Amino acid sequence: MRLILLGAPGAGKGTQAKFICEKFGIPQISTGDMLRAAVKAGTPLGVEAKKVMDAGGLVSDDIIIGLVKDRLKDADCKNGYLFDGFPRTIPQAEAMKEAGVAIDYVLEIDVPFDAIIERMSGRRVHVASGRTYHVKYNPPKTEGVDDETGEALIQRDDDKEDTVRKRLDVYSQQTRPLVDYYSDWAAKGDATAKVSPPKYRKIAGVGDVDSITARVFEALK
């Protein structure tokens, strides 16, 4: 099982990725984790990436694809892999195809932006314990305070509505086009590609977690 999980920030990809990886016995591959590991290990690509990052630049797609290809040689990838947060852009998707990275499924978790904004902007956190609440779906017994300690809850900057909207804008411009890219490739094929087209699946990411997970596994049959 080799797949890419697509969906907006806050669509619940992280939760479903965990279930998919457990069910199929595959690793979740995050480019951030890969970069940190390569830099720490001092691999040739890691050294190159560190130079760019130390200068405040963005690591090039060539370096990222090189890291991906190295990572896929590891023994834990023999049953497959799940890409989390990658590819983010069309050039990255093209580079993956060109590099012959095989993908069986592209699964989109579709959640309306209004629902994501409500989901994320309603989160409240007790910093010391990490306990999380939601003003609508999982409210504390007393508004604004932690159930166990009575200490104040905060809204993280990442969860503030204007921040969420900005992240959704970036997703719309950069990552959303991947949905069309993969659905077109799945539908029409590409005779020049080194790998077979993936199957493209889209599920609704609204409702309780168990229902969404059931939809995910049904889509991956």
Curated annotation (Swiss-Prot):
Top-level taxon of the source organism: Bacteria
One GO process term, biological-process aspect: AMP salvage
Primary role: Catalyzes the reversible transfer of the terminal phosphate group between ATP and AMP. Plays an important role in cellular energy homeostasis and in adenine nucleotide metabolism.
Name listed for the protein in its UniProt record: Adenylate kinase
Complex formation: Monomer.
Residues involved in AMP binding: 31, 36, 57-59, 85-88, 92, 156, 167
A cellular component annotation (GO) from this entry: cytoplasm
SUPFAM superfamilies, alphabetized: P-loop containing nucleoside triphosphate hydrolases
Annotated region described as LID, given as residue ranges: 122-159
NCBIfam families (alphabetical): adk, PRK00279.1-1, PRK00279.1-2, PRK00279.1-3, PRK14527.1
Predominant location category: cytoplasm
PROSITE patterns (alphabetical): ADENYLATE_KINASE (PS00113)
Pathway annotation from the record: Purine metabolism; AMP biosynthesis via salvage pathway; AMP from ADP: step 1/1
Family: Belongs to the adenylate kinase family.
Catalytic activity of the protein: AMP + ATP = 2 ADP
Gene Ontology terms, MF aspect: adenylate kinase activity; ATP binding
Gene3D superfamilies tied to this protein: P-loop containing nucleotide triphosphate hydrolases
Cell location: Cytoplasm
Documented EC number(s): 2.7.4.3
Sorted UniProt keywords: ATP-binding, Cytoplasm, Kinase, Nucleotide biosynthesis, Nucleotide-binding, Transferase
Residue ranges, annotated region (NMP): 30-59
Residues that, per the record, bind ATP: 10-15, 123, 132-133, 207
Domain comment in the entry: Consists of three domains, a large central CORE domain and two small peripheral domains, NMPbind and LID, which undergo movements during catalysis. The LID domain closes over the site of phosphoryl transfer upon ATP binding. Assembling and dissambling the active center during each catalytic cycle provides an effective means to prevent ATP hydrolysis.
